[in-house]
Amino acid sequence: MLKVTTAHIHFNRDNTPVSEQFDDIYFSTADGLEESRYVFQEGNNLWRRWLQFGENHFVIAETGFGTGLNFLAVTALFREFRTQYPDSPLKRLFFISFEKYPMSCADLRSAHQAYPQFNSLAEQLRQNWLQPIVGCYRFHFEETVLDLWFGDIADNLPQLGDYMVNKIDAWFLDGFAPSKNPEMWNENLYKQMFRYTKPAGTFATFTAASAVKKGLESAGFSLQKRKGFGKKRECLQGFKPLNAEQNPAVHTPWLLSRSATLSENTDIAIIGGGISSLFSAISLLQRGANVTLYCEDEQPALNASGNKQGAFYPQLSDDDIHNIRFYIHAFAYGQQQLRWAIQQGIEFEHEFCGVALCAYDEKSAVKLAKISDYDWDTSLYQPLNQQELSEKAGLPLPCGGGFIPQGAWLAPRQFVQNGFAFAQKCGLKLKTFEKITALSQSEKGWILHNDKNEQFHHETVIIANGHKLKQFTQTARIPVYSVRGQVSQIPTSSQLLKLKSVLCYDGYLTPADQAKQFHCIGASHVRDCEDRDFSLQEQQENQAKIQLNIAEDWTKEVNTADNLARTGIRCAVRDRIPLVGNVPDFERQADEYRNIFNLRRRKQFIPQAAVFENLYLVGALGSRGLTSAPLLGEILASMIYGEPIPLSEDILHCLNPNRSWMRKLLKGTPVK
């Protein structure tokens, strides 16, 4: 079940929200805000610890988001701390929270009315509130980052994964009373908490129930009781002892992501110039990194990111649940980042017009029927009949299909180039006509060698150069391939102007641009081809596809005869999901893991996968770069900084650059 189940609540005489699922109040009827401050902020000694904290970020995890009151209160407190102590090394707060039954937006607004001091934060929270499927969603509140996990904590907490072992500084052990919600308060929860908590990390909770106390002690926490809030006699707080096991077992060391070794200067180079480079740079700049981009062209966005119009929507697979989940989470984060870009004044043509998916033949009809079986929230996907889909498109269609109401088109080249101009104002150093031909390691990081025999030294390097990903010796064994795609630009007409949404069949057609002059139609798909010359055959095929798949009179006005087109080379991978993370050392992994099949079978020690330290990549975005790049850039920046990653571990494993080798090695098949 992917769909999020919302909470059923009512407000009692004190105007306190009450859960009908658990028959319990969300917070104290006396004063919910003061309870939050007393139990969780004071119970974890947050202010004192922040004053003494020597790291860049602090991580809080919470077991029940509810109305978000704890989050709003601690975000306000952290803003006060940053205002009073701007020179503190502590710059960012991460708040991870789990919620099985999120409130409706209307109920959330009603609950927030009691706390007008948080109006601005609460409004920002509600703007991005309900999401279509379970899993992790990241939201930015300036120096505070919220990772909100919708769904059962029993399923989601383990998905923090090996990467988050010993990374959480404080726990807000909240949620409905143990007597009302015994499924959450259990031994599994306490063991997971202990595994993720840093040595000397703390927890605080409103309850002092005997079963909770015993469970936390059994997991390894040191406990103490203190006076409870209001009428409660006692509550609990505690910590993970410093002498606790420092290196708990890693379940999948061959897929474990590694953070970078960073100096105070945090000097990072990006090799590329497309949309994945842009969002990697933005996420790093927001963390205060010194970022230099090396682009081999005269300006960014001259290859796969350079089209005049492109579609923004998730790739919905009918046979790969991890693929579906990744793209839906990427789509949600991408929407948030597009709104952010607009707020920042980054200009680009766009239209949130929706995307119509046509069941144009038997195969596509079967695929869309399978996709419809997932029982999506209608905000994400709507199965429609012929008449309904035609109404969404604004033109008659010969078939039904599906509709993605929050889909859009935007101008990729304009967006990427103006995005980089904005990034330069934020400190990005942009070097054009810099063709990096080789990478070599040094004592302090990496040396970039260009085609003019010059060298550039950087601490950390990200390879984001699209279809040229394999050009370096370190990435030569990554199993990606090139795909040539030609997009045709066609003049509009009286009929084509009626098109209201992006239309997808065995190709796609965009609505008219904002000047109402042209549409984009495409794209050809020629594997293992890097020739960018104009192809008359592909131009004619782009026209023929729509006239064959959508056999309506209006498609006769689609005319590619002007031979206006643009060709780009995409980077793709067989399993249709991008690559992001550490660059794996193929030679060492092939050697060290040659017997991993037997090591697992015998339950023997398996070392972490060999990678090139401080070298990362993002690639194989295929035809969905507009959708996936924002989340991939944020994942990469989080990984480099050792921060929480906004994605379930099982999906993150599917993005790992060494995944294809490991599938073979884990089966006992050698790789060559």
From Swiss-Prot:
SUPFAM superfamilies in the cross-refs: FAD/NAD(P)-binding domain
Residue ranges of coiled coil: none
Location in or out of the cell: Cytoplasm
This protein's GO CC annotations: cytoplasm
Assigned EC number: 2.1.1.61, 1.5.-.-
One Pfam match: DAO
Gene3D superfamilies associated with the record: D-Amino Acid Oxidase, subunit A, domain 2, FAD/NAD(P)-binding domain, Vaccinia Virus protein VP39
GO biological process terms held by the UniProt record: methylation; tRNA wobble uridine modification
Keywords, sorted A to Z: Cytoplasm, FAD, Flavoprotein, Methyltransferase, Multifunctional enzyme, Oxidoreductase, S-adenosyl-L-methionine, Transferase, tRNA processing
GO MF terms, alphabetically ordered: flavin adenine dinucleotide binding; oxidoreductase activity, acting on the CH-NH group of donors; tRNA (5-methylaminomethyl-2-thiouridylate)(34)-methyltransferase activity
Region (tRNA (mnm(5)s(2)U34)-methyltransferase), start-end ranges: 1-241
Positions of region (FAD-dependent cmnm(5)s(2)U34 oxidoreductase): 271-672
Names of required cofactors: FAD
Role noted for this protein: Catalyzes the last two steps in the biosynthesis of 5-methylaminomethyl-2-thiouridine (mnm(5)s(2)U) at the wobble position (U34) in tRNA. Catalyzes the FAD-dependent demodification of cmnm(5)s(2)U34 to nm(5)s(2)U34, followed by the transfer of a methyl group from S-adenosyl-L-methionine to nm(5)s(2)U34, to form mnm(5)s(2)U34.
Protein name: tRNA 5-methylaminomethyl-2-thiouridine biosynthesis bifunctional protein MnmC
Species of provenance: Mannheimia succiniciproducens (strain KCTC 0769BP / MBEL55E)
